[in-house]
């Protein structure tokens, strides 16, 4: 390994670290700064931009943001709330099932924010330690991203692997069952995590603290949201678009044919989701300003800018040193290709973006000759958000759990989400790798 490669690699890592600390569009712009150093300073030729990935994400975000502005996300949250309140005794299993399903349908984990107070309230009122369902609900909302046909990370994987004959249906046949089974197995363990609520010393202290008297006396923590007919229509249209994406991904023969080949999946997703966004705007007439002010639009555009900068930076470095990198990791790729999961996990911890992680490392995995079944099997490893407790829903859950059972420990990493996250990761990876070798 040359000193020049190590120096340039250190620059890339520094840009990722600083960009992640800055937050917002930090990853993207610091990726651009790193690219300026590599190109102007070291003379590296910039790699090709991940245009297809960026455009697919923008198309999906446009449709999802229109749905949110039309009240569709509120409607989905209302349904989720009803499900949680009807099954209080099994909330450690029901809560993650709800956040997993609604993240899969919406392509974003933002639904978790709104159901967390419901989970906290229902579990406390039924004497269940809120830490258990809260932690698994947050983890499930992350892991469901790899199972959603309209999530940024999934459309990116499809774009990279389609030249190898891998279609959307192939990816989902692995990620959907592996995340369902993996999360369920993790729930079995987490259901016994920590002391029972009635025996928890912090909760008992708060019960006797006058400051918490009004909070614990309250029986409602979320107001009922009125849902309009147009909100329901927007959800129906959005889910119809998602279904079309799945069908055309699973059956390329139903796509238009040009020069003897079916239309590429990138263009298919872009056309379908932009059209769905247009239909939502025409039929539901949401406020045009609200579309671009919503949380879905902001998060989606941040992901696009992150991929623009960081993925471009990483690809530029790897293309310049691909021969050296291949030689360096050749033995590892041949003997333990699954070890690529560690790289995905570590980068996802740093960048807090599944889409950016895929766009940065999947081209490297393909260039190194890692088989597509292995790449799909370890895809779930892009969900390392939980390792450092700075992810939005993690912070939110600490505030919503008034019992104090959901917490960050003295040493930062000994937090409520570490064990649920590691268990979920282990089981999902194990099942995902097994399924990918059987199915693909």
Swiss-Prot record:
It catalyses: fumarate(in) + succinate(out) = fumarate(out) + succinate(in); (S)-malate(in) + succinate(out) = (S)-malate(out) + succinate(in); L-aspartate(in) + succinate(out) = L-aspartate(out) + succinate(in); (S,S)-tartrate(out) + succinate(in) = (S,S)-tartrate(in) + succinate(out). Keywords: Antiport, Cell inner membrane, Cell membrane, Membrane, Transmembrane, Transmembrane helix, Transport. GO terms for cellular component: plasma membrane. It is found in: Cell inner membrane. Its main location: membrane. The chain crosses the membrane at residues 1-21, 22-42, 47-67, 91-111, 138-158, 171-191, 233-253, 262-282, 303-323, 331-351, 362-382, 419-439. One of its GO terms (molecular function) is antiporter activity. The keyword Nucleus does not apply. It is a multi-pass membrane protein. Responsible for the transport of C4-dicarboxylates during anaerobic growth. Catalyzes the uptake of fumarate, malate, aspartate or D-tartrate coupled to the export of succinate. May function primarily as a C4-dicarboxylate transporter during fumarate respiration. Required for anaerobic growth on D-tartrate. Belongs to the DcuA/DcuB transporter (TC 2.A.13.1) family. This is Anaerobic C4-dicarboxylate transporter DcuB. It comes from Haemophilus influenzae (strain ATCC 51907 / DSM 11121 / KW20 / Rd). The lineage of its organism: Bacteria, Pseudomonadati, Pseudomonadota, Gammaproteobacteria, Pasteurellales.
């Amino acid at each position: 390994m040359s000193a020049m490669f190590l120096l340039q690699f250190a620059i890339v890592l520094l840009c990722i670290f600083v960009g992640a600390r800055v937050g917002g569009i930090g990853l993207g712009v610091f990726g651009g700064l790193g690219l300026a150093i590599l190109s102007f300073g070291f003379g590296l030729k910039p790699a090709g931009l991940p245009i297809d990935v960026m455009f697919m994400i923008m198309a999906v975000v446009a449709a999802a943001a229109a749905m949110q502005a039309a009240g569709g996300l509120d409607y989905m949250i209302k349904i989720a709330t009803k499900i949680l309140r009807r099954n209080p005794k099994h909330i450690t299993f029901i809560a993650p099932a709800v956040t997993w399903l609604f993240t899969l349908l919406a392509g974003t984990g933002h639904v978790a924010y709104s159901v967390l107070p419901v989970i906290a309230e229902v579990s406390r009122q039924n004497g269940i330690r809120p830490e258990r369902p809260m932690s698994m609900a947050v983890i499930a909302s992350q892991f469901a991203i790899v199972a959603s046909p309209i999530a940024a990370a999934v459309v990116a994987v499809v774009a990279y692997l389609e030249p190898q004959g891998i279609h959307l249906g192939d990816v989902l046949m692995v990620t959907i069952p592996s995340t369902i089974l993996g999360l369920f197995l993790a729930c079995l363990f987490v259901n016994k995590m920590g002391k029972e609520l009635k025996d928890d010393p912090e909760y008992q202290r708060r019960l006797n603290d006058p400051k918490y008297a009004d909070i614990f006396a309250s029986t409602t923590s979320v107001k009922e949201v009125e849902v309009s007919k147009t909100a329901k229509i927007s959800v129906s249209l959005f889910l119809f678009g998602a279904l079309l994406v799945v069908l055309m991904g699973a059956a390329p023969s139903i796509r238009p044919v040009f020069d003897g080949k079916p239309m590429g999946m990138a263009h298919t997703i872009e056309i379908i989701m932009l059209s769905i966004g247009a239909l939502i705007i025409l039929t539901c007439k949401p406020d045009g300003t609200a579309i671009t002010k919503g949380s879905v639009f902001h998060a989606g555009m941040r992901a696009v800018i992150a991929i623009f900068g960081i993925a471009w930076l990483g690809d530029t470095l790897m293309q310049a040193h691909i021969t050296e990198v291949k030689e360096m990791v050749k033995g590892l790729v041949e003997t333990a290709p699954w070890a690529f999961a560690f790289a995905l996990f570590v980068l996802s911890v740093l960048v807090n973006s599944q889409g950016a992680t895929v766009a940065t490392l999947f081209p490297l995995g393909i260039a190194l000759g890692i088989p597509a079944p292995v790449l799909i099997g370890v895809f779930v490893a892009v969900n390392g958000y939980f390792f450092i407790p700075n992810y939005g829903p993690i912070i939110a859950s600490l505030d919503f759990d008034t019992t104090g059972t959901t917490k960050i420990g003295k040493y930062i990493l000994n937090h409520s989400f570490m064990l649920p996250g590691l268990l979920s990761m282990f089981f999902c990876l194990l099942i995902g790798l097994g399924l990918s070798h059987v199915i693909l």
